Amino acid sequence: MSPNQKTVLITGVSRGLGRAMAEEFIRLGHTVLGCGRSEKEIRQLQKQVGSPHDFAVVDVTDDEQVAAWAKRILKSHGAPDLLLNNAGHINRNARLWEISSQEFSQVIDVNLKGPANVIRHFVPEMVKRQSGVIVNFSSGWGRSTAAEVAPYCATKWAIEGLTQALAQELPPCMAAVPLNPGIINTDMLRSCFGGSASGYPTAEEWAKIAVPFLLKLGALDNGRPLTVPIRGAND
């Protein structure tokens, strides 16, 4: 692997932003390691891109699954240069008191515990190597709020704080960044916005801008709340 090629680890690669990023990183010559919950989509993606890329069925809310995945990946590929905690879940549009305990917990588990599980099992090796960038996907709703998405807002505000605290714990050569990807036309957005989601960039359009942006992140970005600079996605 040349010095310019990176090993990129992405959660939530089954569809949406994760899938689009995986395909764009690969197109640019980088090695992608990823996970998702859909066995069908993961198998299809692995067949499509082949080795050295490595995709696995993993539920990031399950710490034991993440631990086993990390053990295998670190042994086979070493620590990633870029770790993208992208997997996410949003509650159905409803007032907070109408959200069941189970639905609330699911949002918390995917959006907050999931990144913590991945960090727990991958970042120690990155710290040992004294290099790497961790990007935890936040949202515009991690810096503002809206009605009927209170659980989602809560998790994204938490991700902002968690990431900035993590940034203070890393050695000077590393970085942890909370990232607002912008507003992108994905299944998640359509569940909130309905038909108006079509007015925003697709995941594939977004990835063409986001991936080069992510590849430029370094130690000087540690702790900085950043936003992908894509036209139309930040309105």
Question: Where are the language model's segments positioned?
Answer:
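C-terminal helical subdomain
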Residues: 172-174, 178-179, 186, 195-235
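Substrate-binding pocket helix/loop in short-chain dehydrogenase/reductase
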Residues: 94-96, 103-105
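The beta1-alpha1 cofactor-binding region of Rossmann-like NAD(H)/NADP(H)-dependent oxidoreductases
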Residues: 57-68, 101
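Residue(s) in the substrate-gating loop at a strand-loop-helix junction
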Residues: 139
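Active-site helix of classical SDR
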Residues: 119, 155
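Conserved glycine-rich Rossmann-like NAD(P)H-binding loop of the short-chain dehydrogenase/reductase
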Residues: 28-44
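Conserved glycine-rich cofactor-binding loop
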Residues: 14-15
